[in-house]
Amino acid sequence: MRSREPWRLPAGQSRAVPFLQAAVLFAALCIFARSAALVLAAFLAAPVPAAQTLLHLGQQAVESRAAESSAESAAEAASAPSPAQEAAAPVQTGVEQYFVALQPDEARPADAGTVTEQQFGQGSGEKYIPCGAGSIKNNTRQTAADIAAEAAQPLPFAIEKDSAAPQVLIMHTHATEDYRRSAGLWFTPGDGARSTDRSINMCAVGRVMTDTLNAAGICTLHDETLNDYPSYTGSYANSRAVVQQYLAQYPSIKVVLDVHRDAIERENGTRCAPVCTIDGRQAAQVMIICGCDNGTSVQLPAWRQNLRFAAAWERSMEAKYPGLTRPVLFSYRFYNQDLTTGSLLIEIGGHGNNLNEALYAGYLAAQGLVETLLG
């Protein structure tokens, strides 16, 4: 009977190669298992109204992991020498990594709606109170002197930098609000400027802001619950319940930002995009809305503290990025701003802006907020 020769590796191949391959595979499986466990734990611990958001984020994590794996495989394949290798595309950095492809003018329908651009100034007259390089538009019975004095006060809270405890919550009462899809100044007829797709609606802007704050050491949570879907009616009651449960679970939260977009439309149906240019790139303008207690229908006992925060953020943004802000709107609006002493609503552009302008504006607003909160 012929004796069997011992198994040998092919010439030039080390036994370490299959061992390393097995080790890499084992490590990848461990990382995936850990990610799945974290998503499950977060789902079980999170506020009930946010469960839908966590499921969505869990799916995003899986897709992201698959994309990373695919990218690694592609990188390995690309590393092999080729006779005519094309130049690699430039690596995107900063806010550009969030940008999306916009519709070209070739896709413009014959009956497309028109968009016009306008840069809004800080305003003048007795209604406008200077706030650093920015301003506050007073639509209340409070005197200009009272508002100016309050705006000069320090923040009513202190943010803990690099803390594991959440400091900021970003959410969206009208999460389905979205932006222009076209690169040119036109929009598709019948486009209601709303979408349940979180990659293009307000959740996309909130994600940029959240990432920017977290990168600066401000622990920030982002809730992506579609509070205005399937019904727009009751959206503020829905978002109030979400915020209350976050505050109960994370009492360390000092700031709650309700991130929206505006809708400026002319009588003839033309949509207006509030714009500015920052560092050579066009951005949507932003506007903070701060509510005031009117003693009857609008009960906001902490309106003074919220106003201090609004004024400080306005000053930081307009000083750092001249032209980015429209005047703070100080008015008898409720918007659930009774829940903390750092509750504000901010409009990031309007339905006339394209998504990339809004994403850039969200990034700039968050950078201004970092300076406001950390000094």
Task: Please annotate each region the language model reported.
Residues 302-329:
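Active-site-adjacent substrate-binding region
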Residues 20-254, 263-268, 363, 371-375:
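N-terminal catalytic or cofactor-binding beta/alpha core of small enzyme domains
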Residues 1-16:
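N-terminal Lys/Arg-rich, disordered targeting/topogenic segments
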Residues 188-192, 264-299:
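A short, glycine/acidic-enriched catalytic loop
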Residues 175-178, 226-230, 261-266, 293-296, ...:
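Solvent-exposed loop/turn segments at secondary-structure junctions
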Residues 240-243, 268-276, 328-334:
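Alpha-helical scaffolding within the catalytic cores
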Residues 169-172, 220-222, 255-258, 287-290, ...:
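Structural recognition of the beta-strand scaffold that forms the well-ordered cores
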Residues 323-375:
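Active-site-adjacent mobile loop/cap segments within catalytic or ligand-binding domains
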